[in-house]
Amino acid sequence: MAAKIRRDDEVIVLTGKDKGKRGKVKNVLSSGKVIVEGINLVKKHQKPVPALNQPGGIVEKEAAIQVSNVAIFNAATGKADRVGFRFEDGKKVRFFKSNSETIK
């Protein structure tokens, strides 16, 4: 099955502490989660790694968020949108459901 949310898509968070925030998808995980730039930041306690010259400390990084809690952002309408699929010239492409505009 083709993915409705892909890497480098701009998405908007629908639920949770970051509701309403927008960001770019960095990674789509096979477990049904996505990692979005600047969204769902958590603090990790990291041990120093002298071999790699990495200092220890508290590091802030993005955690995964369920794909059902984000929606693709339609720049034309300025709102969250749903994704559909159709065939154009023998290729399967994604489109916004609200205005039938092809994505990328």
Curated annotation (Swiss-Prot):
InterPro entries in the record: KOW, Rib_uL2_dom2, Ribosomal_uL24, Ribosomal_uL24_CS, Ribosomal_uL24_KOW, Translation_prot_SH3-like_sf
Alphabetically ordered keywords of this record: Ribonucleoprotein, Ribosomal protein, RNA-binding, rRNA-binding
GO terms of molecular function: large ribosomal subunit rRNA binding; structural constituent of ribosome
SUPFAM superfamilies reported for this sequence: Translation proteins SH3-like domain (SSF50104)
Pfam families with a match to the protein in the record: KOW (PF00467), ribosomal_L24 (PF17136)
One record GO biological process: translation
A single Gene Ontology CC term: cytosol
PROSITE patterns per the UniProt record, alphabetical: RIBOSOMAL_L24
UniProt-listed SMART domains: KOW
Superkingdom, taxonomy of origin: Bacteria
Oligomeric and partner information: Part of the 50S ribosomal subunit. Might contact the SecYEG translocation complex when it is docked with the ribosome.
Membership in a protein family: Belongs to the universal ribosomal protein uL24 family.
Function: One of two assembly initiator proteins, it binds directly to the 5'-end of the 23S rRNA, where it nucleates assembly of the 50S subunit. It is not thought to be involved in the functions of the mature 50S subunit in vitro. One of the proteins that surrounds the polypeptide exit tunnel on the outside of the subunit.
Name of the protein this chain belongs to: Large ribosomal subunit protein uL24
